[in-house]
Amino acid sequence: MITSTFGDGRGHGGIDIADTMGAPIVAVADGEVISAGPAQGYGLWVRIRHDDGTVATYGHNNTNLVTAGQRVEAGQKIATVGDRGNSTGPHLHFEVEDRSGAKTDPAQWLADRGTPIIAAD
């Protein structure tokens, strides 16, 4: 469930998806891990350059299960949900950058690929 939307009046560069501590985080598409480790504000993150050229960031992870340079497939477990960094509770912070590096709405990006998710009311 989306608990914080893209932009949301405070320049939020992604969406927050609430889940339980330790729940699996999976890659949304095939690609190469370009960074996996600590990152200011995110606690632990994984960044993947997907085969379409977009870069996805998966943040506030409790544990990372992949390393930079590793090839991943859609659906592969890459991390677990956590609340590290600037976080108010267990969730996945998910960002998408297009090929030019501009942040784009991850919920719309997922919906365009047949994976719609819902926002909390």
Model-identified regions with their sequence ranges:
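Catalytic cores of peptidoglycan-degrading enzymes
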Residues: 1-121
